Structures are given as structure tokens and as C-alpha cells.
Amino acid sequence: MSSKYAVKLKTDFDNPRWIKRHKHMFDFLDINGNGKITLDEIVSKASDDICAKLEATPEQTKRHQVCVEAFFRGCGMEYGKEIAFPQFLDGWKQLATSELKKWARNEPTLIREWGDAVFDIFDKDGSGTITLDEWKAYGKISGISPSQEDCEATFRHCDLDNSGDLDVDEMTRQHLGFWYTLDPEADGLYGNGVP
């Protein structure tokens, strides 16, 4: 799966910003606030909460769930297995390393497959791209970009071709750079919502 967008491939796992970014996500995913997360919590949020509120079809929800499971299993997570932040961070390091190798070889990545599944849900008009309004609906429902300003910042960061719409390739590139490598082109991806 080839992308027309380059991304920084060198990781910076010891950078305090990278660690803080993933701690923020860990805390966001820790639904019951016990300092540990499970794949159960993540799938519940993704399928029972987000997909339901976005009015995904049963087929879209199943496809999305399969992608969420594969992605977080890539981080070493499993149903019924609690992990604390240090294990979560180690899992992200393994996932990022594997994903970046795939990206460099133009092979499908888990983040792209998840992106394809989620775009199918976001793209209410079937255009193959998402609009700012479609992104704002997701940001509000998911809680990842709770303010209009944060949604707009994400949209601007991801609109690499300045078309006014986002395609899955643009979104994947920016998320890969943001979550995996601290690529400066992706800094501020979620506005003030995520460090």
C-alpha cells in the first residue's frame, strides 16, 4: 500500500513529549480510572460508544472492531489482560517499530487498515473523503478532539493537499507521524487536546 506522503521514520521513544503523549492516551482509554487498561475497555469505547453514536452499520462496526483489536494487539494487549502504563508504552514501541518498517516497504499498516475502516463510517456522503463537519462529529463523539478549535487544528494539519477535504492517506500519514515518531510535520495534530 503506497503513500504519496513521506513521514519521519526515526523513532524518539525516550523523548518526554512522546511519553507524555502516550500517557495522555492511556489515561483517556482507562475508562474505569484504575490505572490499568484492557482491550475490553478499548473495544467497548470504540464499538459500543463511538461506532454506535456515529450510527455505524453492524458491518461497519464489526470491521472497525477487527481493526481496533488488531491494532491494540500489536501493542501487546488482549481481552481480559490488564496492563499498566509501562507495559502500554513498551507495546507502543513494538507497534511503532513494526508499523514503520511496513510503511518504509509500502506494505499495509494496522493504522492504515483502521483508517480505512473508520473513514467508511465518517464519510457519510460516500465521497471517499471527509469534511470538516464529519471530522467534528467524530471529535465530539470520541472525546479525542472535544473542542471545535481542536477539530479544526487536526483538520488543517491533515489536509496536506489543501483540498478542503481529508483522504485516508493524509490522515494516516499525520497520525503515523504524531503517534509513532514525533514527526514535526504532525506536531499539534489534536490542537490542545493531546500533548
UniProtKB/Swiss-Prot annotation:
> What InterPro entries does its record include?
Centrin_CML-like, EF-hand-dom_pair, EF_Hand_1_Ca_BS, EF_hand_dom
Which residues does the annotation say bind Ca(2+) 3? D159, D161, S163, D165, E170
Pfam families recorded: EF-hand_5, EF-hand_7
Select a single GO molecular function from the record's annotations and give it: calcium ion binding
A Gene Ontology biological process term: bioluminescence
Q: At which positions is Ca(2+) 1 bound?
A: D30, N32, N34, K36, E41
Instruction: Provide this UniProt record's keywords sorted from A to Z.
Output: Calcium, Luminescence, Metal-binding, Photoprotein, Repeat
Concerning SUPFAM superfamilies, the annotation shows: EF-hand (SSF47473)
Q: Which domain of life is it from?
A: Eukaryota
Q: Which SMART domains match?
A: EFh
Does the keyword section mention Isomerase? no
State which residues form the propeptide.
1-6
Q: Which family does it belong to?
A: Belongs to the aequorin family.
Q: What is this protein called?
A: Obelin
State the organism named in the record. Answer: Obelia longissima
